From Swiss-Prot:
InterPro entries: Amidase, Amidase_CS, Amidase_dom, AS_sf, GatA. This is Glutamyl-tRNA(Gln) amidotransferase subunit A. It catalyses: L-glutamyl-tRNA(Gln) + L-glutamine + ATP + H2O = L-glutaminyl-tRNA(Gln) + L-glutamate + ADP + phosphate + H(+). GO terms for cellular component: glutamyl-tRNA(Gln) amidotransferase complex. Disulfide bonds: none annotated. Heterotrimer of A, B and C subunits. Keywords: ATP-binding, Ligase, Nucleotide-binding, Protein biosynthesis. Belongs to the amidase family. GatA subfamily. PANTHER family: GLUTAMYL-TRNA(GLN) AMIDOTRANSFERASE SUBUNIT A (PTHR11895:SF151), TRANSAMIDASE (PTHR11895). It is an enzyme of class 6 (ligase).
């Protein structure tokens, strides 16, 4: 039962082959048995899950139907969940229980999903390895000595290990797509504004976006259907009609124009990953796609721009965690200034403190023009590069990551090396574009992903290309040994 995809579960529930409660109990037992090896969950919500599963079964018995009715999943631990700990992977929010549900959580609950728990993550979503969590590093089920990627590493590891069929993630600079690539999943970052950010604890407000993580494009389509849509509570939510993502999965790729940027194949890319990218291009050509080279001339400036903008926004967003209203509070402060200083110094981990300091520096009076304003200009140039490329092609294809998963601890003391792992993913966030990573092979037994990017609100196109690719390849069906 645990091997089933979300789509297979939907069919099984509709045909009454099993109940949601039966499935939920099987998966909760599996999590209890296997997750100690992975550390993919921060909180388990067994009682809530059984209650939701029983309610879903009752709704189905009353004649209701729906692809997500009774489907089990987990939420990344930065989505507010009413009455349940929402820690953001940080000591700062270790005891915080949200007073309300995030829009993503409430929309999926209305569709009948069953919440098994909250998944581990890099602290405040800052990281590419899921090593900065207050609750310990998450291990990659493909090799327990390796990282699963981040910051949605808990969601990625749990789905890859077949602890559950799908999970929510968030993506600020690749935090859905990069862990999806490193754990053999399909992960989608929607267009900025496609999915509500209300109740999603912010890292960088102009870059953050929630999305689905699952084993197949078909499953991502089902989950995105339940997540997407306008939300008046989110000022950045865009009132754009939500198409039927599943309906477009089987569209032929004949004549589809795929662009491969020449700048993607630079010195930092593992040549074995480059080879797998070229092989995936050949498969898509066999399906009728037309492949041509395009250029993204400002790609080289993306990482410096991103690591000014994201920390700048983080320094502002995280200023609310001061030990006064909620979250961690130091003991016996001498005065208000001491309360602020010690609560933040003790509550935040080193990577979060590093980014807050970088961001505050970039926003300071003497450096705002030189750093923050300059980074925003580069952001506009990157966006223009994509607009020019999409005038010639329908989809852009390239590697998701420059390297496969690395050993836990290997890059902990070298932040720059870790930041460079985001080279291919951050541009979609800077431009607000939708991006998808899909399984494309293995290097030394570790999964590798290929990334697809499309124009605004063309998530359906990305899912269609990935689904067609998954009809002629079997990378996405492979499971890690022992899980």
């Amino acid at each position: 039962m645990h091997q089933m995809t979300l789509a297979e579960i939907a069919r099984g529930l509709a045909e009454k082959k099993f109940s949601s409660e039966e499935l939920t109990r099987v998966l909760l037992s599996r999590i209890a048995q296997l997750d100690p090896q992975l550390n993919s969950f921060i909180s388990l919500t067994e009682d809530l899950a059984i209650t939701q599963a029983q309610a879903a079964d009752a709704r189905r018995a009353a004649g209701e139907n729906g692809p997500l009715l009774g489907a089990p999943l987990a939420h990344k631990d930065l989505f507010c969940t009413q009455g349940i700990r929402t820690s953001c992977g940080s000591r700062m929010l270790d005891n915080f229980k949200a007073p309300y549900d995030a829009t993503v959580v409430s929309k999926l609950a209305s569709a009948g999903t069953v919440t098994l728990g909250k998944t581990n993550m890099d602290e405040f979503a800052m990281g590419s390895a899921n090593e900065s969590s207050h609750y310990g590093a998450v291990k990659n089920p493909w090799n327990l000595e390796c990282v699963p990627g981040g910051s949605s590493g808990g969601s990625a590891a749990a789905v890859a290990a077949r602890l559950l069929p799908a999970a929510t993630g968030t993506d600020t600079g690749g935090s859905i797509r990069q862990p999806a690539a490193l754990t053999n999943l399909t992960g989608l970052k929607p267009t900025y504004g496609r999915v509500s950010r209300w109740g999603m604890i912010a890292y960088a407000s102009s870059l953050d976006q929630a999305g689905p993580m699952a084993r197949t494009a078909e499953d991502c389509a089902l989950l995105l259907q339940g997540m997407a849509g306008f939300d008046p509570q989110d000022s950045t939510s865009i009132d754009e009609p939500v198409p039927d993502y599943s309906a477009s999965l089987n569209t032929s790729l004949k004549g589809l124009r795929i662009g491969v940027p020449k700048e993607y194949f630079s010195a930092g890319l593992d040549p074995r990953i480059a080879q797998l990218v070229h092989e995936s291009v050949k498969e898509l050509e066999k399906l009728g796609a037309i492949v041509k080279q395009v250029s993204l001339p400002n790609l080289q400036h993306a990482i410096p721009a991103y690591y000014v903008i994201a920390p700048a926004e983080a320094s502002s967003n995280l200023s609310r965690f001061d030990g006064v209203r909620f979250g961690y509070r130091c003991e016996d402060p001498k005065d208000l200034t001491d309360l602020y200083k010690r609560s933040r110094a003790e509550g935040f981990g080193p990577e979060v403190q590093r980014r807050i300091m970088v961001g505050a520096y970039a926003l300071s009076a003497g450096y705002y023009d030189a750093y923050y304003l300059q980074a925003q200009k580069i952001r506009r140039l990157i966006k223009n590069d994509f607009m020019s490329a999409f005038a010639e092609v329908d989809v852009i294809l390239g590697p998701t990551t420059p390297n496969p998963a690395w050993k836990i601890g290997a890059k902990t003391h070298d932040p720059i090396a870790q930041y460079l792992e985001d080279f291919y993913t951050i541009t979609a966030n800077l431009a607000g574009l939708p991006g998808l990573s899909m399984p494309a092979g293995f290097v030394d037994g570790l999964p590798v992903g290929v990334q697809l990017l499309a124009p605004y609100f063309q998530e359906g196109r990305l899912l269609n290309v990935a689904h067609q690719y998954q009809q002629v390849t079997d990378w996405h069906t492979r499971a890690p040994e022992g899980f």
